[in-house]
Amino acid sequence: MSNQRIRIRLKSFDHRLIDQSAQEIVETAKRTGAQVCGPIPMPTRIERFNVLTSPHVNKDARDQYEIRTYKRLIDIVQPTDKTVDALMKLDLAAGVDVQIALG
């Protein structure tokens, strides 16, 4: 397992939640003796929506909404067996999407 690399991608709508989850992952990996690169903040994706408030006339009256998607990237360079076991047992917040890739 020493030649592999674990890449963890985190996505969330709440930046506080994603930073807290990334910190937990980094602390867990360092505690088990692995080298960690990150968390690396990726560009924030902003989706904006314009909605007409009036059903008939007044096209100038609109509401504007946006959804921000925050992303973080964590690389674990030299994972040990303890690292993988600790990451599997780690309980993260419900609002964070986690993708794990071995490379």
From Swiss-Prot:
The keyword Ribonucleoprotein applies. One of its GO terms (biological process) is translation. Keywords: Ribonucleoprotein, Ribosomal protein. GO terms for cellular component: ribonucleoprotein complex; ribosome. HAMAP family: Ribosomal_uS10. Involved in the binding of tRNA to the ribosomes. This is Small ribosomal subunit protein uS10. It comes from Acinetobacter baumannii (strain AB0057).
